[in-house]
C-alpha cells in the first residue's frame, strides 16, 4: 500500500499478554488508547493490525498523556496477575520492584523513570521518527487516495 503504512507494518512484533489490553473508541484516530481487559485480540482482528503496532502507538500516547502514565503505574502496582500489564506485555512483580528501586536511586519519580524508559523504547523502535509524524503522513496519503478515488 503506502510507504508510511509499509513502515508501520515493518515495526517490531511484540508478544502480547492474553489479558490486559489496549483498545480505542469508534473513531480510531480520535480517541486515546485505554487499558481494557480481554479485548485486545478483538481490536486487532477488527482493524487488521498487529499487536506490536498497537503497543507502539500506545507508547507514544503514554508519553503524551500524564493521566495515562498514572493509570499504567497504578496497574503495575496491583496484585492481580492479569492487571500487572506494561504496554501489553506481562509485567512481573520484580520489574515493579526494580522500577521503584531505580527511581529511588536516581532521585526521580516512578512516572519520570517510566517516561524515560518509554522514550528510549520509542527511539529504538521508531528511530528518530515519532509515531505522530507517521500518523500525519498516513493521513496525508489517505487524503490523497480519497481525492484520487472520488475525483476531487
UniProtKB/Swiss-Prot annotation:
Keywords: Bacterial microcompartment, Carbon dioxide fixation, Carboxysome. Its main location: other. GO terms for cellular component: carboxysome. Disruption phenotype: Loss of McdA oscillation, carboxysomes (Cb) have much larger size variation and cluster, forming irregularly-shaped foci mostly near the poles, with smaller foci elsewhere (Cbs are usually regularly spaced along the central axis of the cell). Double mcdA-mcdB deletions have a similar phenotype (32 degrees Celsis, 80 umol photon m(-2) sec(-1) constant light, 2% CO(2)). At 20, 30 or 40 degrees Celsius (60 umol photon m(-2) sec(-1) constant light, 2% CO(2)) Cbs lose regular spacing and instead form large aggregates, increased level of RuBisCO at 20 and 30 degrees. It comes from the Bacteria. The keyword Protein biosynthesis does not apply. It is found in: Carboxysome. GO terms for biological process: carbon fixation. The keyword Cytoplasm does not apply. Induction: Transcription is reproducibly circadian, under control of RpaA. Self-associates, interacts with McdA probably via the C-terminus of both proteins. Homohexamerizes. Probably a trimer of dimers. Interacts with most of the shell components of the carboxysome (CcmK2, CcmK3, CcmK4, CcmL and CcmO, but not CcmP) via its C-terminus. McdA and McdB together mediate carboxysome (Cb) spacing, size, ultrastructure and probably inheritance in the cell. Together they prevent Cb aggregation. McdA is an ATPase that forms dynamic gradients on the nucleoid in response to adapter protein McdB, which associates with carboxysomes. The interplay between McdA gradients on the nucleoid and McdB-bound carboxysomes result in the equal spacing of Cbs along the cell length. McdB may have an additional function in cell divison. Stimulates the ATPase activity of McdA, causing McdA to be released from DNA. A type 1 McdB protein. The N-terminus (approximately residues 1-18) is intrinsically disordered, and not necessary for hexamerization; its net positive charge modulates liquid-liquid phase separation (replacing Arg or Lys residues with polar Gln decreases phase separation). The central domain has a stable alpha-helical structure (approximately residues 19-121), dimerizes and drives phase separation. The C-terminal domain (approximately residues 122-152) probably has 2 alpha-helices and is responsible for hexamerization. This is Maintenance of carboxysome distribution protein B.
Amino acid at each position: 500500500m503506502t510507504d508510511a503504512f509499509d513502515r508501520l507494518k515493518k515495526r517490531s512484533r511484540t508478544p502480547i499478554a492474553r489479558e490486559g489490553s489496549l483498545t480505542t473508541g469508534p473513531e480510531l484516530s480520535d480517541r486515546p488508547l485505554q487499558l481494557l481487559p480481554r479485548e485486545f485480540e478483538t481490536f486487532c482482528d477488527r482493524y487488521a493490525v498487529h499487536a506490536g503496532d498497537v503497543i507502539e502507538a500506545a507508547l507514544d500516547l503514554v508519553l503524551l498523556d500524564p493521566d495515562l502514565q498514572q493509570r499504567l503505574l497504578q496497574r503495575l502496582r496491583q496484585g492481580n496477575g492479569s492487571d500487572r500489564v506494561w504496554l501489553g506485555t506481562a509485567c512481573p512483580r520484580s520489574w515493579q520492584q526494580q522500577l521503584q528501586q531505580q527511581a529511588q536511586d536516581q532521585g526521580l519519580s516512578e512516572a519520570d523513570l517510566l517516561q524515560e524508559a518509554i522514550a528510549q523504547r520509542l527511539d529504538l523502535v521508531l528511530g528518530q521518527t515519532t509515531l505522530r509524524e507517521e500518523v500525519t503522513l498516513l493521513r496525508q496519503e489517505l487524503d490523497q487516495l480519497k481525492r484520487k478515488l472520488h475525483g476531487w
